[in-house]
């Protein structure tokens, strides 16, 4: 499987713009590991490196991630692309999962793992890439516009009157006549994408928010009450019992 996420632990608020500047300069863009938006798209190695792969799952995963990066939604969105039915990328456990077939791509929707796992459902079979992406555009935008706040696609689907048949009718058959509108709205979102790191470091008003102490100088921004210890050649914050902090004694009134 191919999945990349890099965590930088221990950074303080005032340090973030400087870290983002360095990452931007190296060619990185902001991700959304905690936001209500798209996570990195998971992929197996596909036909490029696997004898079982029937299509380029890595290439499609990159295309999908670049298309939907930064997309805001009622809850987090997870996607995966598997290059064959052996399903090494676990696409049938994602909000949107794609599996390669001999005739195209199978599109699965509304799955998730976690505390209440739900198997994704097959929305459409043997799609060419253009049709696949068009259906995903419609699905995501229909979900974003109709789901409740903090509602995953799985719960949204379970609460949907008419179930999968209704969802197929809306997304595939355009039963509500919304397809063009949904696609246009997604095109607008994609066309107005911005790298939030770059925006934050280049916009003085936004950058001013990243200060530990508003009235302190740059040299005085570090929070002295944040203390770390080293574990496995990495740092972690000290817990309450480990911290050496001068405390105000409590006395009876």
Question: What are the residue ranges of the model-derived segments?
Answer:
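Flexible, glycine/charged-enriched surface loops at secondary-structure junctions
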Residues: 1, 33-34, 74-77, 145-159, ...
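Small-residue-enriched alpha-helical segments and adjacent helix-cap loops
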Residues: 1-102, 204, 208, 215-221, ...
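Terminal amphipathic helices with adjacent charged low-complexity linkers/tails
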Residues: 10, 14-22, 26-27, 158-187, ...
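Glycine-rich loops and low-complexity Gly/Arg-rich segments
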Residues: 24, 32-34, 68-70, 103-107, ...
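Generic secondary-structure signature for well-ordered alpha-helical cores
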Residues: 24-28, 66-73, 137-149, 172, ...
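Alpha-helix boundary/capping detector
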Residues: 46-49, 90, 115, 165-169, ...
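Mobile "lid/hinge" segments at catalytic clefts and subdomain interfaces of large enzymes
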Residues: 78, 83, 87, 92-158, ...
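Charge-rich, low-complexity terminal tails
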Residues: 179-229
């Amino acid at each position: 499987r191919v999945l990349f996420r890099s965590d930088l632990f221990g950074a303080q608020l005032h340090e973030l713009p400087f870290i983002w500047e360095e990452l931007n300069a190296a060619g990185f863009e902001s991700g959304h590991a905690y936001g209500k938006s798209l996570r990195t798209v998971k992929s197996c190695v596909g036909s490029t490196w696997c004898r079982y792969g029937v299509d380029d799952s890595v290439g499609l995963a990159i295309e999908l991630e670049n298309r939907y990066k930064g997309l805001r939604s009622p809850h987090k969105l997870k996607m995966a692309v598997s290059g064959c039915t052996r399903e090494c990328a676990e696409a049938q456990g994602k909000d949107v999962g794609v599996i390669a077939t001999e005739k195209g791509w199978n599109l699965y929707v509304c799955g998730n793992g976690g505390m209440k796992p739900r198997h994704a459902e097959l929305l459409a079979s043997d799609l060419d890439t253009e049709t696949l992406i068009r259906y995903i555009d419609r699905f995501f935008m229909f979900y974003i516009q109709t789901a409740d706040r903090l509602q995953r696609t799985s719960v949204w689907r379970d609460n949907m009157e008419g179930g999968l048949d209704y969802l197929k009718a809306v997304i595939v058959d355009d039963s509500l006549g919304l397809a063009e509108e949904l696609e246009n709205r997604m095109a607008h979102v994609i066309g107005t994408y911005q790298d939030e790191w770059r925006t934050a470091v280049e916009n003085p008003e936004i950058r001013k928010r990243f200060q530990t102490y508003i009235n302190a100088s740059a040299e005085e921004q570090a929070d002295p009450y944040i203390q770390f210890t080293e574990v496995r050649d990495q740092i972690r914050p000290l817990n309450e019992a480990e911290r050496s902090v001068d405390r105000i004694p409590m006395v009876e009134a």
